[in-house]
Amino acid sequence: MSDDLFERRQAERRYALKFLDYEILSSKGEVTGRGLARTLNVSESGLRLETGQFFEPEQTLRITLGFDNDLVQINGCVINSQPESDDLCSSGVMFLEFDEADRRTYQKHFTALKSALEE
């Protein structure tokens, strides 16, 4: 990782632009909103996304990512959200919950991305 004293990330990031679908979940697990976003970077434990929606810290999202012919669904918690322009915000999301099959699929694609970027 970085020697930067202000860097708080625990996992190394890989830069990959993918589109994703998200649902905003209430504290009761009910869907209160939905939209599309794109990933700015991904790691084993989270991702940074860009969208027109500003999220509050600790907001729970259900994210669906598409990898080739695979769909992966992840529940995550917004760690931070900041405006990037008048129309766009970026948000850091920490993964909370994976189905085991989705975890394996995500890990397979993340490992392939990591290998491709290291070459």
Q: Whereabouts are the PLM-identified features?
A:
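Short, solvent-exposed secondary-structure boundary/capping segments
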Residues: 47-51, 84-95
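Short solvent-exposed strand/turn elements
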Residues: 15, 21, 55-57, 89-108
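N-terminal helix initiation/capping motif
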Residues: 1-42, 107-119
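Hydrophobic core residues within well-ordered beta-strands of beta-rich domains
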Residues: 16, 35, 61, 72-74, ...
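Short conserved beta-strand and strand-loop elements enriched in small hydrophobics
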Residues: 19-26, 59-71
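Short, conserved beta-turn/loop elements at beta-strand boundaries and strand-helix junctions
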Residues: 25, 44, 81-86
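Short, surface-exposed secondary-structure edge patches
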Residues: 11, 50-54
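Short beta-strand-centered aromatic/proline hotspots
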Residues: 74-80
